[in-house]
């Protein structure tokens, strides 16, 4: 079975044709439970997200701030496994028809087996994978299997990436380029920063692939700011925080849906 890279490409192109940025939500699998995590993904999509990244929780998430680490810890204590990530992708995609990616560090895939992981992700209806710590020069095996199974390979670029490095990354990536707008770990910050705009400009000089910005957006005004210069706005910690701060799971889901609706206005310039 082929994965849904084309659905991802079409979704991003449709947003562009509407003169807006795409809204991409990040939520960890297994948080607060596997079923609850699936409901959260569906709530984000119902609220207005175009795409969702499902995180594979990791015990040492080097790029993630305290909010996502807390959610990952809850998911790991609950015993979340790769099979649960695949179930999350499958059920969310079947319920919504929207593109779902997995965001994961390389080590779990390496242990699980690249062919097994890509085949199962495609079979679940996944659109691709974001691999923040996989160096491009070590990605040939992954890309071979991802291409075979119709999955996007999304690499992360940062303000510290030199122009030659950006060209190297964008030459082999697919789906979109994940531009990390601030150096350091994920979280919500007061200002997304001018660094992001410069990074998008430099990345676009090397590719026609959409460039989406993550790390720092938490409200409609910030989403509108980023949507002014990027092809997509990626929001993670703000969704997770809504769930962590909620008095119960139902309120958490409503918080996710409401935030997605607010951000969806932002990417349309209605903030």
Curated annotation (Swiss-Prot):
<dbReference type="GO" id="GO:0005829">
    <property type="term" value="C:cytosol"/>
</dbReference>
<dbReference type="InterPro" id="IPR011060">
    <property type="entry name" value="RibuloseP-bd_barrel"/>
</dbReference>
<comment type="subunit">
    <text>Tetramer of two alpha and two beta chains.</text>
</comment>
<keyword id="KW-0822">Tryptophan biosynthesis</keyword>
<comment type="function">
    <text>The alpha subunit is responsible for the aldol cleavage of indoleglycerol phosphate to indole and glyceraldehyde 3-phosphate.</text>
</comment>
<dbReference type="InterPro" id="IPR018204">
    <property type="entry name" value="Trp_synthase_alpha_AS"/>
</dbReference>
<dbReference type="Pfam" id="PF00290">
    <property type="entry name" value="Trp_syntA"/>
</dbReference>
<keyword id="KW-0456">Lyase</keyword>
<dbReference type="GO" id="GO:0004834">
    <property type="term" value="F:tryptophan synthase activity"/>
</dbReference>
<feature type="active site" description="Proton acceptor">
    <location>
        <position position="53"/>
    </location>
</feature>
<comment type="pathway">
    <text>Amino-acid biosynthesis; L-tryptophan biosynthesis; L-tryptophan from chorismate: step 5/5.</text>
</comment>
<keyword id="KW-0057">Aromatic amino acid biosynthesis</keyword>
<dbReference type="InterPro" id="IPR013785">
    <property type="entry name" value="Aldolase_TIM"/>
</dbReference>
<dbReference type="GO" id="GO:0000162">
    <property type="term" value="P:L-tryptophan biosynthetic process"/>
</dbReference>
<comment type="similarity">
    <text>Belongs to the TrpA family.</text>
</comment>
<dbReference type="InterPro" id="IPR002028">
    <property type="entry name" value="Trp_synthase_suA"/>
</dbReference>
<feature type="active site" description="Proton acceptor">
    <location>
        <position position="64"/>
    </location>
</feature>
<keyword id="KW-0028">Amino-acid biosynthesis</keyword>
<protein>
    <recommendedName>
        <fullName>Tryptophan synthase alpha chain</fullName>
        <ecNumber>4.2.1.20</ecNumber>
    </recommendedName>
</protein>
């Amino acid at each position: 079975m082929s994965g849904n890279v084309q659905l991802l490409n079409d979704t991003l192109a449709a947003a562009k044709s509407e003169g807006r940025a795409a809204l991409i939500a990040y939520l960890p699998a297994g948080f607060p439970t596997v079923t609850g995590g699936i409901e959260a993904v569906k709530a984000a999509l119902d609220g207005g997200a175009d795409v969702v990244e499902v995180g594979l929780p990791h015990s040492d998430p080097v790029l993630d701030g305290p909010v996502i680490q807390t959610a990952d810890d809850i998911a790991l204590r609950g015993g979340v496994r790769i099979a649960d990530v695949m179930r999350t992708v499958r059920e969310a995609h079947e319920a919504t028809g929207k593109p779902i990616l997995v965001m994961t560090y390389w080590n779990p895939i390496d242990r699980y087996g690249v062919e097994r992981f890509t085949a199962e992700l495609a079979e679940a209806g996944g659109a691709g994978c974001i691999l923040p710590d996989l160096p491009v020069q070590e990605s040939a095996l992954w890309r071979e299997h991802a291409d075979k199974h119709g999955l996007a390979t999304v690499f992360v670029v940062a303000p510290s990436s030199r122009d030659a490095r950006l060209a190297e990354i964008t030459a082999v990536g697919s789906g979109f380029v994940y531009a990390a707008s601030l150096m350091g770990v994920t979280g919500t910050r007061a200002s997304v920063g001018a660094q992001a705009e410069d990074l998008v400009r430099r990345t676009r000089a090397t590719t026609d692939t959409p460039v989406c910005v993550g790390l720092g957006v938490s409200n409609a005004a910030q989403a509108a700011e980023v949507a002014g210069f990027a092809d997509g706005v990626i929001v993670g910690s703000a969704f997770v925080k809504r769930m962590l701060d909620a008095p119960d799971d139902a309120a958490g889901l409503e918080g996710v849906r409401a935030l997605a609706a607010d951000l969806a206005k932002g990417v349309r310039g209605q903030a």
